[in-house]
């Protein structure tokens, strides 16, 4: 199973990029959720503008789909500068990074997505660029090779990652601002869904937006994807506004339940409950029971279920919690 194939995957899908970009907030006063991040960034940006400085380098981390790229764009807009965008895997050679850095204007933003995937060679070039706004370049080869230093304009590097722990300490320490994005609450997601509906020209009732929001796994990207699928359903199966009833029918048809679980989530939980009496069960046995690789369970299925309190990891294996039993209308006693 590929994570991107799931409707409730938080990973970006290229075909959605254009629509997602159109629905993104452009400024901090349009940014919903993450109140602590918003408050801090407002102060940091105002202070940098007041001094006439580039904003300190910024690291944004957190689960996928929470708006790291959106926040980077907002920072550039608020600072009134351009933003160049790239990603860690794309920067294969030091020259790739040098080409980007030497084309920056003063105070511009360089945004590197998946910054934890930078190669060591590229990362070494980044250190003096971040710290001293200087670029060390090797000219020539062999004994005739020499290093020259190029001065760079003051700029802001914004790095985004889902795996902050994978960053090397020297790189992490060079970020003056570090922000973690958290999962969104239902109220904030409902507002985001309502705003996206306006962008799409949809007649969405508060009950309809609530139904989409509560099944979106705390993630704006998933909320917007579900909204588009509900729109498809309403255009074919109903007329008029997207009400709570219409949204419920659409999401039930798509097999996304009230917790935001899909078929694979439920299959995993029911395997633990039905086949292994609620656990504990070892990962290899569980993988065999549902016909998936153990890596798929560990990296794709488990994290959200654990975070929501439906599965517990123990030294003896995985166990279903009371939340899992209640979700299916069961109790431990039902299993004998």
From Swiss-Prot:
This is Holliday junction branch migration complex subunit RuvB. Homohexamer. Forms an RuvA(8)-RuvB(12)-Holliday junction (HJ) complex. HJ DNA is sandwiched between 2 RuvA tetramers; dsDNA enters through RuvA and exits via RuvB. An RuvB hexamer assembles on each DNA strand where it exits the tetramer. Each RuvB hexamer is contacted by two RuvA subunits (via domain III) on 2 adjacent RuvB subunits; this complex drives branch migration. In the full resolvosome a probable DNA-RuvA(4)-RuvB(12)-RuvC(2) complex forms which resolves the HJ. Pfam families: AAA_lid_4, RuvB_C, RuvB_N. The lineage of its organism: Bacteria, Pseudomonadati, Pseudomonadota, Gammaproteobacteria, Enterobacterales. Gene3D superfamilies: 1.10.8.60, P-loop containing nucleotide triphosphate hydrolases, Winged helix-like DNA-binding domain superfamily/Winged helix DNA-binding domain. Has 3 domains, the large (RuvB-L) and small ATPase (RuvB-S) domains and the C-terminal head (RuvB-H) domain. The head domain binds DNA, while the ATPase domains jointly bind ATP, ADP or are empty depending on the state of the subunit in the translocation cycle. During a single DNA translocation step the structure of each domain remains the same, but their relative positions change. One of its GO terms (biological process) is DNA recombination. DNA binds at residues 294, 313, 318. It is found in: Cytoplasm. It comes from Pectobacterium carotovorum subsp. carotovorum (strain PC1). Residues 258-336 are annotated as: Head domain (RuvB-H). One of its GO terms (molecular function) is four-way junction helicase activity. SUPFAM superfamilies: P-loop containing nucleoside triphosphate hydrolases, Winged helix' DNA-binding domain. HAMAP family: DNA_HJ_migration_RuvB. The RuvA-RuvB-RuvC complex processes Holliday junction (HJ) DNA during genetic recombination and DNA repair, while the RuvA-RuvB complex plays an important role in the rescue of blocked DNA replication forks via replication fork reversal (RFR). RuvA specifically binds to HJ cruciform DNA, conferring on it an open structure. The RuvB hexamer acts as an ATP-dependent pump, pulling dsDNA into and through the RuvAB complex. RuvB forms 2 homohexamers on either side of HJ DNA bound by 1 or 2 RuvA tetramers; 4 subunits per hexamer contact DNA at a time. Mg(2+) binds at residue 69. Residues 4-184 are annotated as: Large ATPase domain (RuvB-L). Residues 185-255 are annotated as: Small ATPAse domain (RuvB-S). Keywords: ATP-binding, Cytoplasm, DNA damage, DNA recombination, DNA repair, DNA-binding, Hydrolase, Nucleotide-binding. One of its GO terms (cellular component) is Holliday junction resolvase complex. Its EC number is 3.6.4.-. Belongs to the RuvB family.
